[in-house]
Structure formats: C-alpha cells, structure tokens
Swiss-Prot record:
The keyword Cell membrane applies. It comes from the Bacteria. The lineage of its organism: Bacteria, Bacillati, Bacillota, Bacilli, Bacillales. It is found in: Cell membrane. This is Sensor protein LytS. It is an enzyme of class 2 (transferase). Keywords: ATP-binding, Cell membrane, Kinase, Membrane, Nucleotide-binding, Phosphoprotein, Transferase, Transmembrane, Transmembrane helix, Two-component regulatory system. InterPro entries: Bact_2-comp_sensor_kinase, GAF, GAF-like_dom_sf, HATPase_C_sf, His_kinase_dom, Sig_transdc_His_kin_internal, Sig_transdc_His_kinase_LytS_TM. It comes from Bacillus anthracis. The chain crosses the membrane at residues 4-25, 45-67, 87-109, 116-138, 153-172, 184-206. Its EC number is 2.7.13.3. The gene is lytS. The keyword Nucleotide-binding applies.
Length: 589
C-alpha cells in the first residue's frame, strides 16, 4: 500500500506542475475569474479535460495484488484496475467552473477511462460523471451565495467523491471488495491531498494577481489624490514640478519628466543636469509621441534618442497627455536599467496618464467657467466640485483592498460622471439620456459610499430620452434630495424620478420621503440663496434661474413639501425644442 501511495504522489506532482504552468497563462486566470458565455465554459472544459486525461494515462495498473509500474498506460487488461488522480481534475473543474464545466469534464474523463478498459472501467466512468455533477452544483451554490471554496473543503469533498467511486466498484464489479481493499485508502489519501495542493496553488496565484492589481490601483489613486490640486492649475512649470516630485516619490522610477508640446516643464531624478525645465525637447522619442499621440517605450539609449552623450537613462515609457482628444504634452518615466521597465510599470504609466488627462480637462473646465461671466445662463451652470472627487477617490481606494472588481466599475462610473460634467459645462442643452447617465454615475458613487442607504426609482418614458434638457438639472435635484432630504437615522430613504409627456410638454418630478421643509423656508427656496445650517439652496436657485432664462417663467420650479412627509419638486419644458444652436440663437436674440 505504501508503494502505491508513493507512486500516486509522483503522479500528483505531474498534475500540480501542469496546473502551475496553466495558472501563469493570462487567459486561464481570466476564465477562472469569470466565464462570459458558453465559449469560455467550453475552453475550461477542454483545459481541465487535459488534467483528467493525463491522470488516466499516468494511472497505476494493478493486476490482483501486483502493481504494474508503467509510466504511460496505453490500455488496461480486462482483469486489471487503475489507481489514478482523475478525481482531482474533475473535482476542481466543477468547484471553479460550475455545473456545465463539471459535467463536461466528468463526462470526458469518464468516457476516456471507460475506453482504457479494465474491470472497473464502467464504475469509474459513472463515478467520474457523478463527481462532475456533484462538484459542479456545489461550486454553483458557493458562487451564488458569494462563499469562498477553501482547499480544506476541496480535500474533504475529494474524500467523499473517491468513497463514492469505491461504492460504485462494490456495486458493479464482481470481485469489488478485493479491489477496494487495495486502492481505496491510497486513492482517498492522494486525491484529497492533491486537490488541497492544486487548489491552494491556483488560489495563491490568483490572489497574488489580485493583490498586485489592488496595490497598483491604490498607488495610482494616491498619486491622483496628491496631484489633483496642481493639475487644476494646468500644465505650468510650477505645477508640473510638484507633480513630477510626487510621481517620483511614489513610483520609485529613476526619473520623471513632464512636457508640453514644445519644452520640458519639469524633470526630477537622474539626468537633471541636461533635462532642464524651460529648455526645448531633447529626446526624439518625446517628439514622436507628440506627433503620433501614441504610447511608446524604449529599452535603449538609441531608441530614447537623447541628444546628450552622457545621459544615464537607458529605458523609458512616454505617454501622451490629452485634452479633448488633442495631445497637449507628455508624461515620461525613465529607468537606468532596461529590466526595470516591466508590464507593471507600463500599466501604471498608462493609468496615470488617463487620470492626469482628466484632471487637466477638469482644470481647464474650471478656468473656462470663470471666463464666461458675460453669459449669464452659462455662468449659472454647475461647477465641478473637487470635494466630490476626493470622496470618490477615497471610496474606490478603500474598495481596492476588499473588492477589486467593484473598484474598477466605480472608476468607470467616476469617469462617466466627470465626462458628463465636462460636456455639460460647454452646452446649454443635452439629450435627456445623457443627463440620466450622469444621474446614474452619481448614484453609483454615492451608493458605494453609503451601501443600502438610498433607494432611487426612475420612471422615464423611452421616447423622451432624445429630448433636449438643460444639463445638471436632474442630477442636482437628485443630489439635493440625497444630501438634504433625509435625517441621519431614517431607515428607508426613497427618491422617485418621473419624466413623462403631457399636452406637448415634458414633465419632470423628483419626490422623496424625507423630513420635509418648513413653510417659511419653502417660500424662499428657488427664488434666492438663503443662509441656513441645512444648506443655502444655491442648487435649486441656479436650476430655477436657468430654466427661466432658457424657456420662460412658466417652466420655473414648483416645490411642495410637508414636514415629516417628504418633498416633491416639479417643472416642465417644451418637448420639441429643436437643435441646441437654434435655442442659443433664440435666447441671444
């Protein structure tokens, strides 16, 4: 028995090595995280079927009490049986891939085992299929209830499944008792041990990747948080100097440089003696990035093409900084050792460049809003609030350590939110669908900060989504409700948004079940800015002024509220307002 255990452990080592190699393939790791449709499930079935087929071929043939020491089985005599590690592959596939993958792998493993022959061919084939069904549905239940499958659980489950196989042998094979006495204990021990090792290794590699992504995201967000005040000032030598110092401190690169389209704005680290701020660009790589607008990397001085002969910088990645689709500068990370420029550094640089480009657009939008004082309506449009960005960054940063996928989705919602801010700040009217996207992005971020606190229901007629509306009106009304309508301890905070057509006008209603507004304050809201601990009413005043300025007094806000009952804000606008250019002309005339 001991010899059989030792020989089977050798086979486990082969399967573990195969699993280790596969775990370092990006596609395999992605499939374990998420299967998008039947094609991905088919890929997993093929991969894990290889495990089981290898296990069948490397099984140990046993004829009576004699162990046949063959490295690769071509077939099994009708009087022999096989002790193998097939259940490892079937069990892990079901736990990680679910019912379809488990049943698929179990069926292939069972059919292949049956084709090899032997006294236990039929019983092993049936038990393989049953193993796929059982582990597949257990994996599905664990995933449904968001529970983690531990290696210990996998080992215990393997004991049960191999025991089930032994029962099948007893039921089907004529001399099953002697076979079970020979192979039961070795197969139970080795398969449970192998399942524990294989799942532990796969999960460790996946966890290592998740931790690396979380740390990388956390690093990017910290840099973004630190650099935001400077990028709001635009691409100036002073602001870029502080930004370069922050990036250099947090990334550990040998040098960091920022440029505009003509000159170096800041350079921190090695080669500062000839990469001098305010001097013209001296690397051909930077000029090429500015010309093409594409990310470029170099792993030699020749490719960097620095005009200074003694430049110690041997590798670089140069990323374009963009604003509204135009390249306005570059971010450059330099290294003195080409081996330091790995895929991790490339992804870090790409992430920073995207965030910096957004920050530059935010700064430009803020500057332009200050220059539009001659346009009264545009001056009333909502300004970008940096405090909201700080709160959102802190929320995503916290999620990076607990839920990387949710943090990624929130980053996308944050991008949508600020894109809507930027677009809205330059337009008098936008499609209702764009405004609803703005509202949804804001809600996603707020609900991430305060889980299960707010319930927002939206009732929108589909044919009205192309109607032109003033930007920010719904978003600010929903934000106003979430911030001011509810006392801290209110258990159910509900907001309803209704948009419908009636008599050629588009009607908007925003209702909440909050604490309501006192009658004295209610008379002032929307008509003036008021002083209060609960807020100044600036958002409602701005919305009201914009509606009146665009469509006339008949479209002004109507606010109804009862203390401890809730508030309802309504307004109407014409449905067929035409193109934005026509509206602008009619207003200016």
């Amino acid at each position: 028995m001991l010899n059989l255990v030792l020989m089977m452990i050798e086979r486990v080592g082969l399967i573990v090595i195969l699993g280790f190699l596969l775990s370092h393939i990006k596609t395999f790791r992605r499939l374990l995280h998420k299967q998008d449709g039947y094609v991905d499930k088919l890929k997993l079935i093929c991969i894990f079927s290889v495990f089981t087929i290898v296990s069948n071929y490397t099984g140990i043939e046993i004829a009576g009490n004699t162990i046949m020491n063959e490295n690769w089985l071509q077939g099994v005599s009708s009087s022999s049986t096989i002790a193998n590690t097939r259940i490892m592959g079937v069990g892990i596939s079901g736990l990680l891939g679910g019912p379809i993958v488990g049943i698929g792998v179990g069926s292939i493993a069972g059919i292949h085992r049956y084709m090899l022959g032997g006294t236990t061919a039929l019983s092993c084939a049936i038990s393989s299929i049953l193993a796929g069904v059982i582990t597949g549905y257990i994996g599905y239940i664990f995933k449904k209830y968001n529970r983690t499958i531990t290696p210990k659980f996998s080992a215990v489950l393997s004991v049960f499944i191999v025991s089930l196989e032994m029962i099948m042998i007893l039921l089907i094979v004529e001399d099953g008792i002697s076979i079970v006495k020979t192979i039961a204990i070795p197969m139970i021990l080795v398969n449970s041990f192998g399942s524990f090792i294989l799942l532990s290794m796969i999960q460790a590699i996946l966890r290592q990747e998740e931790n690396a992504k979380a740390l990388q995201t956390h690093k990017v967000l910290r840099i973004a948080d630190k650099t935001l005040p400077y990028f709001r000032q635009g691409l100036t030598e002073e602001s870029c100097k502080h930004v370069a110092q922050i990036i250099h401190r947090f990334t550990g690169t040998d040098a960091v440089s920022l440029t505009d389209t003509e000159k170096i704005l800041a350079h921190v680290g090695l080669a500062s003696d000839h990469h001098i701020p305010s001097h013209s660009l001296i690397t051909g790589l930077s000029k090429e990035v500015l010309h093409t607008g594409k990310i470029m990397k170099a792993k030699s001085r020749e490719v960097i093409n620095c005009q200074h002969e003694g430049c110690p910088l041997q590798a670089a990645i140069v990323i374009p900084l963009t604003s509204h689709g135009n390249t306005i500068g570059t971010l450059k990370l330099y290294f003195k050792n080409p081996n330091q420029l790995s895929r991790v550094e490339e992804e870090l640089a790409e992430g920073l460049a995207k965030i910096f480009s957004t920050q530059l657009e935010l700064g430009e939008a803020e500057l332009q809003s200050k220059l539009l004082q001659d346009a009264e309506i545009k001056a009333l449009q909502a300004q970008i609030n940096p405090h909201f960005l700080f709160n959102a960054i802190n929320t995503v940063s916290a999620l990076c350590r607990t839920d990387v996928e949710k943090a990624r989705k929130l980053l996308l919602q944050l991008s949508v939110y600020f894109r809507c801010n930027l677009q809205g700040a330059r337009q008098l009217l936008i499609p209702l669908e764009q405004e609803l996207n703005h509202v949804q992005a804001y809600l996603s971020l707020e609900q991430a900060r305060f889980p299960n606190k707010y319930e927002v229901k939206m009732y929108i007629e589909d044919e009205l989504k192309t109607t032109l509306v003033p930007p920010f009106v719904l978003q600010l009304l929903v934000e106003n409700a979430l911030r001011h309508a509810f006392p801290k301890k209110q258990p159910v905070c509900e907001v309803e948004v209704h948009v419908f057509e009636k008599e050629g006008m588009v009607h908007f209603e925003v209702k909440d079940n909050g604490q309501g507004i006192e009658e004295e304050r209610l008379e002032q809201l929307g008509k003036m800015v008021v002083s209060s601990k609960k807020g100044t009413g600036t958002a409602l005043y701005n919305i009201n002024e914009r509606l009146i300025g665009l469509f006339g007094k008949e479209t002004m806000l109507h606010i109804e509220s009862e203390v401890n009952e809730g508030t309802e804000i309504t307004f109407v606008i014409p449905k067929k307002v035409g193109e934005e250019e026509q509206i602008v002309k009619s207003i200016s005339s």
